[in-house]
Amino acid sequence: MRRDYKAVLFGNGTMGERHRKFFEYSDVQFLKIFDLEDLDSAGNVRASLVDEFVSKDKVDFAVIASPATTHYEYAKLCLKRGISVFVEKPLATLGAQAQELVNLAIRNNVILFVAQSECFNSVFLNFRKHFMNEIGAAGSSFRLEFRREHKYSARCRDVNVALDLLVHDLSLCLSMFRYEDLKVEKFTISKNEDRAQMQISIVKGAHAGAELDFIVDRNSDIDVRTIFVEFARSAKSPAYDYSVSLAPHDENGEVIHISDSLENEHKFFLKLMVGACSEWGRRAAQSAANAVKLATIITASS
């Protein structure tokens, strides 16, 4: 059933504007857009504005698309007031803070949704369906390499590349494999915090022995988002390896964003708001917190 929701928006930059337009298309009315002019000298939203607009009697949910370092405080502010939250990735910049937000949402019986749009990418969803069928037959004899690189951008410089890019691919990984079954074998991040590599082993469960590699670079010469699949040769495994591009490229080699990824995540959030798929929603929030835990594990510089 379609409802006319009221919301507030924290941060009206590139992603904030995109989220606002998608929600407004679904008849969501934004009562207040908090941006730089609404901050006090300490960089926090002025208390008088919070008291005026951030109330569950006035709004149904909050959209948080402010700098990543503010996600935890704004999400906590809203969840404590009984307001559901749609927040850009990463959920927080510390694993403990991310878990705190998940627990707070459960305790207050409100929705916490992390906008990790790649999880709603139709290309990935199709890949995941077929890949999980393949490894059902192949057992644990596989290796995945997630690679995500793009040219320098001034956006998202308040966090390192792990919290900026790696969380995308960790969230994809966690939609296929259990967090409890994973072990980080190696994690290095460059001194300029623009490039990182992570190696994860699946150490428990049906796919124990499989390997997952992650490479991210936000100051690269190329623009690429791929998953490479490699199978160990056995009678059970497929006789081929392959790679999947999560985004098409234009004639200049630039990534073309798949619009249905954003559209699908907004539609799903609105389904959660009417009470549908609630258990899936809780698992997705926990997965987002687990992605932060992995992305903030003790690192080595290179």
Regions found by a protein language model. Name each.
Residues A92-C156:
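A contiguous active-site-proximal alpha/beta segment in oxidoreductase catalytic domains
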Residues H19, G43-L104:
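Beta-loop-alpha module in the N-terminal Rossmann-like domain of NAD(P)-dependent dehydrogenases
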Residues D158, D164-S243, K267-A276, I297-T299:
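Contiguous beta-strand/loop segments that form the cofactor/metal-binding neighborhood of enzyme cores
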Residues M1, L9, F61-S66, V110, ...:
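C-terminal helix-rich "cap/oligomerization" subdomain common to oxidoreductases
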Residues R18, L39, D223, P238-Y240, ...:
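Active-site loop of classical SDR/Rossmann-like NAD(P)-dependent oxidoreductases
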Residues M1-G43:
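N-terminal Rossmann-like dinucleotide-binding module
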Residues V28, R81-I83, N108-I111:
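A short helix->loop->beta-strand "cap" motif at the edges of active sites that frequently abuts
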